[in-house]
Amino acid sequence: MQQTLSYSSSSPSPSPMPMPSASAAQTPPPNPNLTPNLNIRPSTNPIPRPRSTGGESAFQPAIIPVDYSYRTHTTRSILSAQSMAPSTFASNQSFVRQPSESDAQPYSSLFGDPVPPPLQPDDYFGTAAFETLRNGSVELPSSEEDALVAAMALNALIPAARERIFPSVPYSRTPRGSLLPYLQPPDIQILPNSSGGSSSEQLGSPNYRLLAPDDILNKPDVYDLENEVEEYTVVGQRMSFDDEEDEPTRTPSQAPAKLSVSSITTEDHRGLLSDSYSGRDWFRPAPQHFPEFTRIPRLRPSSKMIMSMKQDEGPLSPLATMIQDMNSSSSGGEERVAPNQSRPVSRDVVLSPKQYLEEQLGLERGSQRQSLEDYRMPPPPADPPPFRRTDLTEQDDSRSVEPEHSLKREMSPVIIRDSIPMGGDYRVEQPRPHKKTAFTILSTGQAASSAPRPPQQAPTRGRHASIQSTSTTTSSPAGRPQISPRRRSIFGSEPRLPELPSALGYTSHLVHQTTDDSPRPSVQFNMSGRHSRSKLAIPQKGILQQRDSLTSSIDTFTPRAQIRRGSIGRDPIRSLPYGQKIKSMETLPLINDQHRSSIPRLHYGSTMDLSRPEPAVFPPGALPRPLKPNLNPTRRQRGLLKIINKEESLTHNPPRSNWCSLDDLSRPSFDGTPNQARRRSSSTSPERRSSTQTVSDRRSSNLSSVTATTSDFSFRRPTLSTLPAAQTLSRMRRKSVQALSPNRIPNRIPSFGQRRQSIYQRDQEPKPLSRHGKIAKPSTLSPIIGTPNKDSSSAQSPNHRSSLMADAVDTPSEVSTRRDSVSRIPVRKSPDSRSSSPPKDFGIPASGRSSRASITRSPSRTMNAGSRSPSRSMHPSRTSSRESGRPGDSRSASRGPPSRPGSRLDQIGSRMDRPNSRLERSSSRAERSSSRADRPSSRFDVSNSRGNSRANSRLSINSSSLRSSSISPATMARNRSMRATTPSRRKSISLSPASAMMGRRKSISPDAVGQNRRVSSRGKPEPPEILSRRNSRSRIPTRSTKVASKSPPSSSKKRSKSPEKPKAMGSTPKSNKVGKGVTAKGSPKAKPKIAASAKPKTKTESLMKPPVKNANKTPVNGRPTTNAKKPASKAISTKDAKVEKGKETGKSVASKSNGKETESSVKSSKSQVTKTKPPGGTTSEAKKPATTKTHGITLEKGTNGTDPVGGIPPLAAQVGNAVLQAVEAVPAVTSEVTVPSTPGGKGAGGANMSKLVRMSSRMSLLSNKSTKVRSDSPQNRKVATVQEHATEKEETVGASSQPMSNDAAAILEKSQKTLENIQKTVTEATDEIHKTISENLTDLKSLENDLAADPSPTPSSGTTMARPGESASRTGTADGSIAPQSSGELPKSPFPPTQPIEASVSVLHPNESSAERIASVPEVECESSDLPTALDASESELVGNVMPTPESGADFKVDAKRRSPDGQGGSTAGSGGLAKSSSQEFLEDKDNVKKGGLCGCCSKLFMPCRRSRCSRCCRRRERNESAEDQPVLWSGNSSATTATNVQVIDETKPKRKKISDWLKSSCCRSCRKKPAIEEHEAHQEEVSKRTNQAANMSTGPRTRGKCGLCLSKVFCCRSVNRVDPTTGDETEMKQCCFCIPCRRGSRPNKKGSTVSWRDQDPELGIKPTESSVVEGASEAAMSAATDAGNDQVKEGCCKRFWLMLLCCRKRKRRESNARRQSIRAPPPSEDTRKKLHVDLVEYSSKMKGAIPVLPLYLAWFCAFCNVVFPGLGTLLSGLFCLCVGIPRFSQFDSARARIGSFIINIIVAVSQFFCVLFCFVGWGWSIWWGTIMLRCAKKLSKIKKVERLELEEEQRQAQLAEAGKNGVAEADKT
């Protein structure tokens, strides 16, 4: 406020002071008289003044233009005779300042009366922020802004005034021209002062008060009528300053005095003002008094006190005055402002902040009448304000008379006195409580002025554009300063402003000075608010200034001012010549109501408009505000955050939008619709724009918490807005949500149904609330609290919520940003009443609205399209899941960041699935409350998948913004649409555990977002595109759980899934995956097999009884949302549910219903599973369909044309029963089984079941491992699936399961037999594996816990997670995000951690139907065509889903890998350790092969397309022993850790390999010749290594396939462990299609020593044995490297080159293995990669580093070539480097380094050759290069020699030691 005052006083002083200097003694006494005379003069003096101000003309424009812009325009029309006189003009300038000060009040009256009666503005100002602001004083912020706007508008309206605004600069003749600019800068300074100190209040009030703070406020009559009227009439812009300066001067001699002032000219004024009040001083030229103003900001604490610079104080420097006034009661000054405002709103300041205040008071006094006259364009303001204005002028004149000793000085002091009253009174209701509102207090006073403002408002509006435009012009502000600055000039007690004569030269200079002064004082006072362009751009005291900028945007939104402008000056503004400045004013007036931004902008605009009288006057704060105008408004902004929001609207339609926004804030009834629209549409942009520009400044300016708040809002809102920016709907929604946020406390529940309405309602509420809340000013703590705190407290606390809620309502961007959390919370809370605690979601907000609340709630809403109660119910779930408090279900809700897609999905699934988890409970409640299984299911699916992927992956702001968008009701609708899409995405995720994890990770988060939006839609279908995209990802996890639950949502999901899934699974459920189904026998199971890949429904059939509805989501997932979606759902369910999961769904669900390894009967388990699947929120629905799933799904699938249900249910029954029986903990098996069907669809319940399934899978694998669990493992890693539990499951399945039952019975018998055989093998393997597991389980658990994934107690959980259906857990494991799900699983099936058997079991004789079925089930691709039985079909379906999952999961190369490492060992809690078992090792190989039927390459290539099958290699593999591969994979996936990897290898069907004969034909002989035994041995070695070294286990498979990457998969190179069912012997069978990619000799075994890719790969040119390469390598390592090198040599450079080109490097595989092993504590492994000796490494230059280390002979050759032919040797060295040489970039060789070296050498060689043309430089260069090569080669040879010697020495020592040991031993023996 002090700033504002100082600016005001400084601004007025220049023009008043200069003019009065001649008549300083004369004018002051007459000032009081002149004030009455001014009332009379309006007709007499005004004309003479301009005319007689010939000499003063130069003077006048400087002063009058700014102030006169406001008053002179109107006054000109009214007092054309008066103001026309040059002397009168001079007097007017003096008086203009004073009346300007009082003008603010009259002006408020002026605007208030003419346009919308002052009551509206009063309501507006008093209502929200301005009630607080106007408590003590005339509240310049509203009036001031309105005055600025109105002045601009009136100036525009009044042609004469306009002429004076622009002609007014010339009006002053030569002196005035200069004076005008000069006065304008002071005025601007004053305005910035107001804006800086008290943007809204003190802006206007200081403008007027600064002119004559004491005089105008205390003696309004002196300055008001005569001076201001004359001023406006005669002076024009200059009149503003003249009013302040000359009004005292006029008091002694009105016309003569003014003439004298005019005669005084700029120089005279300077002389008069030169004292302490010289115009410049008053202006506070940056060089001179800027320091003082800088000090003034130091006085900022007192700035809340009105710096009433009394006339005596006036002579003091602005700083001294400010200090004095600060210390003195600013309230008194403000009170003066009120009287001054009551006095005529001197047309000097032409409705500048001062005039604005004067106008406001003008309603109370004659000054206001004159102010109205000034704004006579709008009739209402014209007459009343002039009289009141006259009164104000008289009072001001009286005050001015007091300082008459130095007219300029007196005027400035008077102005100072009147203007400075920014303190106490204004501070009453300052909007930024955190700060001592020196200027905010003015805003408080503005409440009163807000009443008169309606007339001003229209003019302000009118001027709004002009103000902005004017503000934009920095030069014009010079003329403007007189507008509102003149009174605020008080701060510049020294009549710097009065130094008008210098304004001629100083006009622009002063503008800058003002700007400079303003910035610093503005920090402290509103001075910054009036800061000039530079101030705006670079607030020097950044806090207030920056804040002003924020507030400027906010202030711009002053709806009330805007209204007035619209009524009065809007048209004039547009017609104003200073249209550019109107823009600034546009911003300013909009804000003027609430944030006193109008004044700050006016001040700045005045500075800007000094060249243009009116533009300067009107936009003093306008342009500054656009840039960084209202620091003080920023302060108010705290209280008036919604102004900030409205500021956004202002951007589009600044005056109206601003007014509307503020109006909405203050008065709900005002322009409600525009408020909403603008707020939403532009709430973010203007505020952000302004705040963004001033963000650093605002932040840097820590003056007020508003700054922090504003900047935080700016940043946050922009951040959130940016996130939602991409999503306009989201942004709108966010705004709606924001509305909810404000409404949250008052309207939250009411607005639950209507976000957007709620916003508007809230807006309306906050308006009254603002009145009540008094702008919810942040307390002094606000700065400490910070913007967010203030914002949130404002939003939530009653008062703060009133104003800030309105603010938030108005500022969606700010709310979206900073309040996004709050808004989101309200959204959740409101829509989802369950999650009613905002704090709970507050941590989530960034991701919150859309992440937790929105996702969980949204899914609930989506599911409960009709019932929001479930949504709310879901909300707690969502919240819980976000918090990830629940191990299993909480994951979905918690959306733990660790593994976004999988882990989140799994977490969601597990949390939602786990009834104990709050998420599940809340979900269950949501389900129950909604009692719509479909909706809860869909919601859960969306919530789980989306919550997991999105909450976890998008806990960040981005994710939250996306979610946030999704959260709004519209988003909820969108989420529903998304549901349709999710199934396919879910399918994709469901593919293979590893690939599913990858896919989820990749796609779930987007899908999650989509689902979030869809959930946000709350049943309102949002754009299906977004939904399908987002939903598909997140949906997969959720769907499994909620397939049955969400029949209708599933329909949507099915639709979307159907399209998406077909990509991975093939659009046609049955025939899409023909390749996969090719092997399928004609039997129904064969069909399901086809469906397995192309027909998710088959899987759904067997796995998901409910999915029957949802053919797609047959799996326990709520996927089968609708039978209508069956077709799409089939493919989707296959993917998502994955037949495995479908089969296991019942069990999994059962176990899920238990929530843990429930050991309830299969039936109860099944029904519970059905219930449990939906537990997230689909529980009630899921329960119904769950049972239906078992029965109806299978049947439905048969109906759908998927495999006959009979085939699948037996599989499901077998799997379920076998798993249940095999695993003592049926729930665990069930969980495992369910997970597969949950893979994509069962995000919530499925994820939980995943945990259970994994645990049960491990347990069941322990017991059922030898049972055809592995065969069944394709069914979902439920290795023991085929066990007795199958019978139970059949029972549970009931009728629908019976078709499968028959098969299941046979399969069960066979499987039991096989199980016995397998169990033997498994027992052995289990013992071994248990050891490994025991060793690694602890590490795995600890790692999983560390990974934030709740590791299931047993690796089986990991296996379950690894399932495609369990993509969530799988994903979580790989990413570490699965860990939460694992954790959830841990509680579910905790006891099989060590139980899980990782033994890779391949059934060699799948002749038995059970074995066949098992094999076929693993082979989703129909590789197990041997098992065309129902079980086979069901398994095929299951695997088909799995296969599609790998297809979709094909992207997830990690899918298989994760299955085995993540899914098996890594993914599951104990999976890491278990993964190390031979089974896991096998799985790794299989993973690479992609059991899903997609090779890793195909997965990568086609996963995005969701291609159901992989290319030739995959098809071949399908025909080949995919059953072997996939069963293992599935075992690894479903129960990799727990269950033995069981492969049913039909030895009678070894011809499958023959299918790949064509590929094999291309294999190299060595590869073809390689006996499987050798490979098996190598594999066994690797297996043993893995078993012993859990960390190295994943590496083992890599070594086996050196490429271990795309090539091995592309060419289907994979090794399968064949297990003889009778003997249990395991044989590694290598299926190699292409020798080069495979390269799988026994070398992998040697990998230990030659770990580096180049050691193993022929790519590395140098053999690992080279001592130079193998630095520090052990002898064994060296020998191993040598062996590997020999192998490499055999392969040859060409092969290496191709391998390199094919990117078939182990490094990738190592990375994947690292991911797998990431779960386990990685054992400290030495880097066995070959190292180049440090001495040979070239670190300094890449170019030199490209010179390879070559063998000495090659180096000599290259050097010779370089000498003979420059560059040739370099080129050859590059070529040699590819095969032989070693690049010296680093110690470690790599293909990239070699290629890089080759490229660099080519470049260098060419350069060397061509450089020979230039002075033979290239020759020397070439020779130098050859020398370096020789040197390196020699060094290498030396190193090799030394190493050889060392090696020999070591060997000798070892021999000696051995001999010594032997001798000792012999001695001991003897």
Swiss-Prot record:
CC terms in the record's Gene Ontology section: dendrite; membrane; sensory dendrite
Keyword Cytoplasm attributed: no
Region entry Disordered, spans: 1-63, 90-117, 238-266, 323-410, 444-535, 606-709, 724-1208, 1261-1301, 1336-1480, 1643-1663
InterPro entries: SPEC3/Stum
Composition-biased stretches (Basic and acidic residues): 386-410, 686-700, 880-889, 911-938, 1133-1146, 1450-1461
Loss of function: phenotype: Impaired walking characterized by walking uncoordination and reduced climbing speed. Type I neurons are apparently unaffected. Abolition of responses to stretching: although the dendritic stretching is not significantly affected, the Ca(2+) responses to both acute and obtuse joint angles are abolished in the mutant. Axons and cell bodies are indistinguishable from controls, while the sensory dendrite exhibit abnormalities: in some of the stum-expressing neurons the tip of the dendrite is overgrown and extended into the distal segment of the joint.
Alphabetically ordered keywords of this record: Cell projection, Membrane, Transmembrane, Transmembrane helix
Biased composition (Gly residues): 1463-1473
Chain intervals with Pro residues compositional bias: 616-627
Predominant location: other
Tissue expression profile of the protein: Expressed in limited populations of proprioceptive neurons that sense a mechanical property of specific joints. In the legs, localizes to 3 labeled neurons: one at the femur-tibia joint, the second at the tibia-tarsus joint, and the third spanning the second tarsal segment. Dendrites of stum-expressing neurons in legs are stretched by both flexion and extension of corresponding joints.
GO biological process: proprioception; sensory perception of mechanical stimulus; taxis
PANTHER family noted in UniProt: PROTEIN STUM (PTHR21676:SF6)
Protein family (similarity comment): Belongs to the SPEC3 family. Stum subfamily.
Function according to Swiss-Prot or TrEMBL: Required for locomotion and mechanical sensing in proprioceptive neurons by transducing dendrite stretching into cellular responses. Required for transduction of mechanical stimuli in a specific subpopulation of proprioceptive neurons that sense joint angles. Probably does not constitute the mechanically activated channel and may rather serve as an accessory module required for the proper localization or function of the transduction channels.
Protein known as: Protein stum
Native species: Drosophila melanogaster
